[in-house]
């Protein structure tokens, strides 16, 4: 008799995705982040669901409802901090996952990569709206500043901003709709992740060498299930340590002050995972130019497959490209640091140089270096 997992309509989908899936025998721990992102999403949906049971999306009671969750709800503080720090873990995994894709040429799977870029935008939008919900000072002013950027769009800009606000400023209507979108988007993300996997399984996984691994495949279970469990345990350990020992390490103290439209905080800045994009936005003196640079800083990922000039897929055997990749990583860390600094000398010029270098590396230097490497190998 054939095993039920191979015949049952539902079971065979799971079987072909997580059990009998042929996987390359040489994929490293950098391939763990897909499953870790899935775990992060499940953690965020579950903790978010329990938070939504006690949260009220009204400007008068939003801040005190979060206080109520932390003080009066059984383990409410734990749920709240798991959710807040879970977002940080989500973005750490996301950045590492995207970095892995860039390094090993996984972007050559065009459909998978483009859905991944779409997922990145969706997660960033969700995180931004979630940050507004506690209705602290940084929530309110962050929402005001970022939504106001849309007014830079010619002709329709100011109407668009008022349409998003649901009034003439960030107020009750804005908070209510942000809560609604923040609740629904994770389910859209889950559906998109399913499509992401669907396209990945059409081609099979890439591997560190960037060469075809069709001749050497192993079943996903038990080899990679056990490997993913190890990754999951490390993720949960780090998240638990963060939540239990220093839950506010990555947060902003200003968000413990209730939102006050009459009092602007001295330094308005987003959560740490948006700082690199915020630094790029601030490095351009023109408003519309800044908004375009902000969008392009992420959208540029969609053009990476078109900029691939190397005859090799992975950077594993390309030392010059490897050096440039790590320069790009250092540049992004510099931008993250600058995004959290006040707008004054010397931070302005450092931010501008780092922003120029970011776009130059991806659009010009790396493609030219790839051509140079082809030439070295007489390809």
UniProtKB/Swiss-Prot annotation:
Paired cysteines (S-S): none
Binding site for heme b b566: 97, 196
Family annotation (Pfam families): Cytochrom_B_C, Cytochrome_B
Alphabetized PROSITE patterns for the sequence: CYTB_CTER (PS51003), CYTB_NTER (PS51002)
Cofactor note: Binds 2 heme b groups non-covalently.
Cofactor names: heme b
Primary role: Component of the ubiquinol-cytochrome c reductase complex (complex III or cytochrome b-c1 complex) that is part of the mitochondrial respiratory chain. The b-c1 complex mediates electron transfer from ubiquinol to cytochrome c. Contributes to the generation of a proton gradient across the mitochondrial membrane that is then used for ATP synthesis.
Family as reported in the entry's similarity comment: Belongs to the cytochrome b family.
Note: Heme 1 (or BL or b562) is low-potential and absorbs at about 562 nm, and heme 2 (or BH or b566) is high-potential and absorbs at about 566 nm.
Subunit structure: The cytochrome bc1 complex contains 11 subunits: 3 respiratory subunits (MT-CYB, CYC1 and UQCRFS1), 2 core proteins (UQCRC1 and UQCRC2) and 6 low-molecular weight proteins (UQCRH/QCR6, UQCRB/QCR7, UQCRQ/QCR8, UQCR10/QCR9, UQCR11/QCR10 and a cleavage product of UQCRFS1). This cytochrome bc1 complex then forms a dimer.
Name this polypeptide is given: Cytochrome b
Organism: Blarina brevicauda
Upper taxonomic lineage: Eukaryota, Metazoa, Chordata, Craniata, Vertebrata
């Amino acid at each position: 008799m054939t095993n039920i997992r191979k015949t049952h309509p539902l079971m065979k989908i799971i079987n072909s995705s997580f059990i009998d899936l042929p996987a390359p025998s040489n994929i490293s721990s950098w391939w763990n982040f897909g499953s870790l992102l899935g775990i992060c999403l499940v953690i965020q949906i579950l903790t978010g669901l329990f938070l939504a049971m006690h949260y009220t999306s009204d400007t008068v009671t939003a801040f005190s409802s979060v206080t109520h969750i932390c003080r009066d709800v059984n383990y409410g503080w734990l749920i709240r901090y798991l959710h807040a720090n879970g977002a940080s873990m989500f973005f750490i995994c996301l950045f590492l996952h995207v970095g892995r894709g860039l390094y090993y040429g996984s972007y050559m799977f065009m459909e998978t990569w483009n859905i991944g870029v779409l997922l990145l935008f969706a997660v960033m939008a969700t995180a931004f709206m979630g940050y507004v919900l506690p209705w602290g000072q940084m929530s309110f002013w962050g929402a005001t500043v970022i939504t106001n950027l849309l007014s830079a769009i010619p002709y329709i800009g100011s109407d668009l901003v008022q349409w998003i606000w649901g009034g003439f400023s960030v107020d009750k209507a804005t908070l209510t709709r942000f809560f609604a979108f923040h609740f629904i988007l994770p389910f859209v993300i889950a559906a998109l992740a399913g499509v992401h996997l669907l396209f990945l399984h059409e081609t099979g996984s890439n591997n560190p060498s960037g060469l075809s691994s069709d001749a050497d495949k192993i079943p996903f279970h038990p080899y990679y299930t056990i490997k993913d469990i190890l990754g999951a345990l490390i993720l949960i350990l780090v998240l638990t340590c963060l939540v239990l020992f220093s839950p506010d390490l990555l947060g902003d103290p200003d968000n413990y002050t209730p939102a006050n439209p009459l009092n602007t905080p001295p330094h308005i800045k987003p959560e740490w995972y948006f700082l690199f994009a915020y630094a790029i936005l601030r490095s351009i003196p023109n408003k519309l130019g800044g908004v375009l640079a902000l969008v392009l800083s992420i959208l540029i990922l969609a053009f990476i497959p078109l900029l691939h000039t190397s005859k090799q897929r992975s950077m594993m055997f390309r030392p010059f490209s490897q050096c440039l990749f790590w320069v790009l990583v250092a540049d992004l860390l510099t931008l993250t640091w600058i995004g959290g600094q006040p707008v004054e000398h010397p931070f302005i010029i450092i931010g501008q140089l780092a922003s120029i270098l970011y776009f130059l590396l991806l659009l010009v230097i790396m493609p030219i270096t790839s051509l140079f490497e082809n030439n070295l190998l007489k390809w």
